[in-house]
């Protein structure tokens, strides 16, 4: 199965420096990202169909509350059917469910989501909603509590799959104060029952944007890691590089300055979408 990486044409329009750096780094690994021309904003991970394996995809309703609840933001909602118009995609199932692609992390025969999925779909009974998702994704759904400090409610900013039964967990343990301690304890309790956890930890003074390192791109032989400092020499960037080199010791790690994206709530994973060709 061949992996292609797609980006919205808005990445080049609105984030030219990030676009150029990403192109340069991906080219080192023989990858030229392709462009999605019929998109309304840069975060293509959220509105493109979800790959469930064997070249099959699931379509869904992209009407996120952070865009749908205020009519002035409706212009930024990409119509999924237009975005895939020129792509040869096998949509194996189309669910009448509101969700974002960022609230989907495939971990083998399991899918990790946040429970924001319930508030986004009040017309569904919770059990029926879960059953429909499991049918479409052909996987068991593992629910994490929604981090209310993060308005998007995406699970891909919380964990990533490392293969087998191992997952990478963001650095919640470094934020364990007050209510955050209770939140991180709940997360670990849920995940410990299903997976072996590798927790991220960064040295020095912790940046409020340290969440961004989880928002990386993975290819067959590389990890493309967001960086907060222009020359990747910030304290957190250096600590993140070392941490990821230890976790992904069989892959090359490259960094891309992504602060222009990060300040708008996303990073490299959010701004890319993977298409798999059999």
Regions found by a protein language model. Give the residues of each.
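The feature marks the mature, well-folded catalytic cores of soluble enzymes
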Residues: 1-278
């Amino acid at each position: 199965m061949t992996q292609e990486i797609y980006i919205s044409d808005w990445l080049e329009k609105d984030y030219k420096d990030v676009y150029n750096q990403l192109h340069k780094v991906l080219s080192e690994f023989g990858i030229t990202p392709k462009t999605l021309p019929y998109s309304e904003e840069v975060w293509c991970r959220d509105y493109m169909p979800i790959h469930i394996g064997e070249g099959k995809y699931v379509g869904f309703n992209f009407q996120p509350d952070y865009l749908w609840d205020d009519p002035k933001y409706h212009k930024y909602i990409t119509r999924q059917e237009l975005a895939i118009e020129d792509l040869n995609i096998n949509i194996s199932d189309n669910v009448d469910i509101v969700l974002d692609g960022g609230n989907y992390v495939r971990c083998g025969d399991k899918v990790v989501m946040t429970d924001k999925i319930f508030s986004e779909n009040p017309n569904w009974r919770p059990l029926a909603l879960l059953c429909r998702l499991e049918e479409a994704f052909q996987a068991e759904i593992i629910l994490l509590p929604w981090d209310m400090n993060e308005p998007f409610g995406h699970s891909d900013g919380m964990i990533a799959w490392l293969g087998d039964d191992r997952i990478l967990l963001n650095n919640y343990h470094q934020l364990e104060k007050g209510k955050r301690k209770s939140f991180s304890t709940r997360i670990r309790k849920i995940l410990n029952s299903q997976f072996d956890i590798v927790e991220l930890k960064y040295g020095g003074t912790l940046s409020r944007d340290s969440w961004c390192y989880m928002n990386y791109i993975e290819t067959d032989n590389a990890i493309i890691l967001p960086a907060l400092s222009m020359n990747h020499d910030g304290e957190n960037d250096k600590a993140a590089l070392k941490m990821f080199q230890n976790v992904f010791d069989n892959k090359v790690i490259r960094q891309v300055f992504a602060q222009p994206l990060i300040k708008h709530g996303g990073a490299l994973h959010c701004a890319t979408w993977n298409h798999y060709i059999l």
